[in-house]
Curated annotation (Swiss-Prot):
BP-aspect Gene Ontology terms: L-aspartate transmembrane transport
Broad class of the protein's primary localization: membrane
Official protein name in the record: C4-dicarboxylate transport protein
InterPro entries found in the cross-reference section: C4_dicarb_transport, Na-dicarboxylate_symporter, Na-dicarboxylate_symporter_CS, Na:dicarbo_symporter_sf
Length: 432
């Protein structure tokens, strides 16, 4: 029996977003006061992300008889991430040159007030590649979970899962216990997801109330260019990859519409991470691949952030009248490939990453970030949506490469079969 439309989660979230926009626009002070609702929902989700990743990765790896497979899956995932991320960076660069969103501003960098971006610049300075790699190693096992650092949690999970796999039958009871605990945490996710409309309402009301729709007008060309480019990237680049793997990107997007609306409302792709992992398992991807690819992708496969970074850099250069040579643009690409790995699925991280990129490329004034500070929140939604779609496609692709994709289930679910996560426990965890 079909649910009444008003009980469907994505309908509730969409309605909440619309109400949030209206409240923020007509009663901005009240809209700003709704911020705790959005923040509270994201904190509830972040509270559960660590245990979800740990349980999923550990049970997935513990079920592998060949430990070389873990390295193989990780290697394929990183190769995919680098290739697609490079495409995203190039597309952002090309779109900015083609559509020229910054031409005509004629702004003198010396007249820009950098106080507003000081906090982002201070956060952006500091981390070298070595420091980034060292940061992945937590001070203690428990500090990884206390800090909520996804890469640190992933490292702990990899070691724990590998140890259980080596112990084999002697550790079987531990694996079974973690599997049962995993079910408990996923049930908690279902409960938290029920309040997603409230979180989306609060976050959207705050965004519109604080920044106002009027702040969009002067920079509509940049916003339109970014959204248009992201849509083209998803439909053409990710669509081609999906077609080569044997599924439709449009149907895939329809399948994860609830997660996308949650991301749209909160501007954070992390808000949908636990539910997304469930959906991908339900779609036919093996638990081991989901557990490895999705958390890693939140630092290494941020397609939307990559498009945004190169486009924003060229926009600032155009707006301030700076001509970039081919070598300077190649330098920007190289730097962006490194700095983008420091981004995460948290709201505002893309802006911090942009500051890090500009700090390494002295040709373009960091002060130019002031131009897009007011609209960054409105671009954050598109970044997060593109990121989560990209990570979903990556997981299906790597599962297919590993021959651990249940293609019959994939076709059935995307063609309108049961896509609910309630019966996820029935999905096998082994080779598909």
């Amino acid at each position: 029996m079909r649910k009444p439309f008003y009980k469907i989660l994505y309908v509730q979230v969409l309605f909440a977003i619309c109400v949030g926009i209206l409240l923020g626009h007509y009663w901005p002070d009240t809209g700003v006061a709704m911020k705790p609702l959005g923040d509270g929902f994201i904190k509830l989700i972040k509270m559960i992300i660590g245990p979800i990743i740990f349980c999923t990765v550990v049970t997935g790896i513990a079920g592998m008889s060949d430990m070389k497979k873990v390295g193989r899956v990780g290697g394929k995932a990183l190769l995919y991430f680098e290739v697609v991320s490079t495409f995203a960076l190039l597309i952002g660069l090309g779109a900015a040159h083609l559509l020229k969103p910054g031409v005509g501003f004629n702004i003198d960098p010396a007249t820009l007030d950098t106080k507003a971006i000081a906090q982002y610049v201070s956060k952006a300075h500091g981390q070298s590649t070595v420091e980034f790699l060292m940061h992945i190693i937590p001070d203690t096992v428990f500090s990884a979970f206390a800090n909520g650092d996804i890469l640190q949690i992933l490292l702990v999970s990899l070691f724990f899962g590998a140890a259980l796999a080596v112990l084999g039958e002697r550790a079987r009871i531990v694996v079974q216990l973690i599997e049962q605990v995993s079910k408990v945490f996923f049930h908690i996710v279902h409960v938290i997801t029920k309040v997603a409309p409230i979180g989306a309402f609060g976050a959207m009301a705050f965004t519109i109330g604080k920044y106002g729709l009027g702040s969009l007008v002067p920079l509509l060309k940049l916003i339109g260019t970014f959204y248009f480019t992201a849509i083209i990237f998803v439909l053409v680049v990710l669509g081609t990859i999906a077609r080569m793997t044997g599924f439709s990107i449009v149907r895939f997007i329809s399948y994860i519409k609830e997660e996308l609306l949650i991301v749209l409302g909160t501007s954070s792709s992390e808000a949908a991470l636990p539910h997304m992992m469930e959906k991908l398992e339900k779609l036919g991807c093996s638990r081991s691949v989901v557990g490895l690819v999705v958390p890693t992708g939140y630092s290494f496969n941020l397609d939307g952030t990559n498009i945004y970074m190169t486009m924003a850099v060229i926009f600032i250069a155009q707006a301030t009248g700076i001509e970039l040579t081919l070598m300077q643009q190649l330098t920007i690409l190289a730097v962006a490939m490194i700095t983008s790995k420091g981004a995460s699925g948290v709201t505002g991280s893309g802006f911090i990453t942009l500051a890090a990129t500009l700090a390494v490329v002295p040709t373009i004034p960091v002060a130019g970030m002031v131009l897009i500070l007011g609209i960054d929140r409105f671009m954050s939604e598109c970044r997060a949506l593109t990121n989560i779609i990209g990570n979903g496609v990556a997981t299906v692709v790597v599962s297919a490469w590993e021959r651990e994709l249940d293609r019959k289930r994939l076709a059935s679910v995307l063609n309108g079969g049961s896509g609910d996560v309630a019966d996820l426990a029935d999905v096998g965890q082994g080779v598909r």
